[in-house]
Amino acid sequence: MTSLHGAESGYRTYETPVVILHTGYDLPGQQKKEKAKRNIRLLEQELKQLGWDENAGAKDGVAKAETAGTDAKACGSEQIPYLLYQLGKSYYMMGEYGAACDWFAQGLSFDLNPALEYVIDMVETYGYALINSGQEQTALFFENIYDEFGKSADFQFLMGLIYMKNARFTEAVREFKKAAGHAECRAQGVNSYRADYNIGVIYECLGKKEEALAYYRKCGGYAPAEERIRELGWG
């Protein structure tokens, strides 16, 4: 783990067996949206105080991301890319995936440390936002950052989805299998039943029913997999 700004000196870290669950967005749909709207207002105010040029904001899309990043750097604030990340997350929580993509693009226009947790999450959530907004072809540019981010189960699972959405099934299966080979992950199931389920779906679509069945059965009672087994008369 590193600090927000990537400084690693001055303190020591170690792994503990403690799991902390954040339930801040574990709310009914409308309450979640209201909380996200409140956060957006606060984040926009903070950006304005830091000298962020609102005319280069997310509403102008990816095309202005590089210019926006340059303007932010001129303000001399290392907080700005993190605030842009939080804005993207807030729009993502509201289901406004296109707007989330624009904010993430601006946040990632900075020269950031790829080891930072928030940078890793920004990259991965950006990928899901692209998929959820119908921009799966655009998401193929994640191939270009694979060397920096592609060592985790979470990123490999995301790449599997990107390939799957683009009907590149061989690459998708490869990435899901790589994800399933990890002992640890951040998002639940991406290194186990969710990866196996998607491999099963691909094999079923390709007419490889025996292979599909084998992967569905590896999902350990995962409801969508059990449903596929029943629907196909294999249960």
Where are these regions (language model features)?
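Catalytic-site signature of metal-activated, phosphate-bearing donor transferases
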Residues: 1-53, 75-95, 99
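TPR-repeat structural position
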Residues: 97, 135-136, 169, 209
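Hydrophobic/aromatic packing residues within the alpha-helices of TPR/SEL1-like helical repeat arrays
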Residues: 104, 142-143, 176, 216
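Single-residue signature of alpha-solenoid repeat helices
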Residues: 100, 138-139, 172, 212
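Start-of-helix register in tetratricopeptide repeats
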Residues: 82, 117-121, 154, 194, ...
